[in-house]
Every structure is written in structure tokens, then in C-alpha cells.
């Protein structure tokens, strides 16, 4: 698939606050190549670098989705949870937006067992089986179902390990990144000025705290995924 510009405009990134990094004293020196300047104690991200890596990420996901590859989007910070869900649903991706359960990828066989239990409980609820049980037992099963829906609902239809994982906050999702590294699963990760860009395959230098910044980056990535799928159908 030939490279595209993906309509990545510096003005839009500035409006979304993509360029605002963390306090300079909290920086990771490995982010130096991606920092433009320091202003009032805050590092300012070089948006030319953001555009370069975001474009590379969009090329990768568009090409992968055109070949039927599966994606997992991970972001459990409270200000991003709803954005993760809506973006994933729009692009028909799997997602984790509440809590990363240790071993979600590295102990996939156990997660598969829990997903099967989740589906069984859902089926019992739909058929009314749960409501025919003794009150205490029914309440217990409903609690289990709510818990599984909250933490595994976004990967309910994931039947194997994902081909690419998109991660919103490197610091918060450190365990997820480590699992991807262990399994050799490629990652695309938003990296703020306090992150380590060497831990991910495609680092996208960006503000990983502001909703507008997260939304803007996710929108570009999910549009690229959708375009890749559309092109595979068209061809």
C-alpha cells in the first residue's frame, strides 16, 4: 500500500494540545530527539516528529488491516476510557479500557477460559436460566457477569492474540507493553516526554494526558484501519 499524508496537519495538532509534554524535570532523556523546546518548565513536543511517526503508524495499520490483521487498543486511564471504547468499536478493534489483567496476553489460555465462562453466563442471562435459579445463586452469577463485562467486554470476540497493539499511555500500561515485548507483538504507543521511546516499535511523540490529544491521534489511527479494511473489500 503506497504511503499517504493521512491529512496530518500541524495546526490541528496544536489545537488539540498534542505538543504539550510533561514538566521538564520529569523528562526521560531518550525523548530528547522529539522535544522542540522548554516553555515555563514544560517540554514542548516537536510536532514534525509526531507527524512523521503518526504517518508511519497509519501506513502500518492500514496495510495490516487490508490483510485482515487484528488490533487491540489499550488505554485504562479514566480520561481516555470512553475514547478507547468508541474508537475501537468504530474500527472493529478489540480493546481494554478498565484494567489490564496481568497475563492477558502472556497467559492467553487462561483468558480464553474466562471468555468462555463470560459467553456461557451471557447465554444463561439471555435464555432466562439465571432468573430461574435461587435468588442468592442468581445474584452471584449476575455479579460475575458484570465483572467479566467490565474487564473483558472489549476482548469478548478476540479468538487469538492480536497482531498489533495500540497503547495510549506507556507509563500506565507498562505491563501490557512488557507482555507484547515478551511475545514479539508489534506495538504503537503514544509517548509523552517522560516515556521511553525504545520500548515500542512505533513511538508517537504526543501529549498522552489531554482528551483532545488522545482523541485526535486515535481518530487518525482508526480511520487508517477502516480505510485498509475498505480497500481490501474493494479489491
Swiss-Prot record:
Protein name, as recorded: Small ribosomal subunit protein uS2c
Entry similarity comment: Belongs to the universal ribosomal protein uS2 family.
Q: Which GO terms describe its biological process?
A: translation
Identify the gene encoding this protein: rps2
Organism name: Marchantia polymorpha
- Report the main location listed first in the record: plastid
GO CC, sorted alphabetically, is: chloroplast; small ribosomal subunit
| Keywords tagged on the record | Chloroplast, Plastid, Ribonucleoprotein, Ribosomal protein
Stretches that traverse the bilayer: none
Q: Does the keyword Repeat apply?
A: no
User: In the record, what terms sit under GO molecular function?
Assistant: structural constituent of ribosome
Can the keyword Plastid be found in this entry's annotation?
yes
Where is it localised? Plastid, Chloroplast
